[in-house]
Amino acid sequence: MKSFSRSANHIGIDMGSSQTRIFSENRLLLDERTVVAVDSKTNEMVGFGTDAIIRYHSNPQRIRLEWPIRNGAMVDYYYTKGILTYFLKKVLKQALARPEIVLSISSGLSSVARHALIDAVMHAGAQKAFLLPVAAAAALGQGIRLDTPDVVLSMNIGQDVTDCGMFSCGLFSEPAH
């Protein structure tokens, strides 16, 4: 895989069942709930993240909340694409180039679910999209090198899913499912 060039926007996204976090250059750009507010009468998306919660509490008879990610997997493509588009626009306000995105994923996702996530990220505005096991993303986020001969066990404990992985010499061992 070609390494990121310095001229492009580089974004890392951790989209969990509860929270979505977006990083760039070791900085947290966004930390919001992974939730979409939907108008019950029109089925239109009317808010995302914190704004979705506020909209729901202002009119619970008209607004319902939808969580597009459950148990570490995308359960609704339309809402996932909508929330990703909104969050990317929010963090890339003035950017001229579309970003290259690395999305952390649960180790148990099927190939169909992986392709659907790549498609959603591309439609949300990515120039390129890559998937990285969440256990690897957690270790790299802590500054741990995964290409050394040392054995590293990394664990990510989320709301619905706990992922772990073992790394050594750049190789990754996924748990059996």
What is the meaning of each model-derived region?
Residues M1-Q159, G165-H177:
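Nucleotide/phosphate-binding catalytic cleft detector across ATP-hydrolyzing
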